[in-house]
Curated annotation (Swiss-Prot):
It comes from Bacillus subtilis (strain 168). This is SPbeta prophage-derived uncharacterized protein YotE. It comes from the Bacteria.
Length: 48
């Protein structure tokens, strides 16, 4: 399983935010990114 770097996720969110200027959409992407990071951490914990 490829590890997802937090910086990569943040970069992705920033790029998406620039494309979609709606703050509502940005908030959705940020919460999605936070969820994604939490999921990755949880999965890492399960793998160990």
């Amino acid at each position: 399983m490829k590890e997802i770097e937090f910086e990569e996720v943040k970069k992705f969110v920033e790029v998406m935010s620039r494309r979609l200027r709606s703050t509502k959409v940005i908030k959705i992407h940020i919460s999605y990114a936070e969820w994604l990071v939490a999921e990755v951490e949880r999965l890492r914990g399960l793998v160990k």
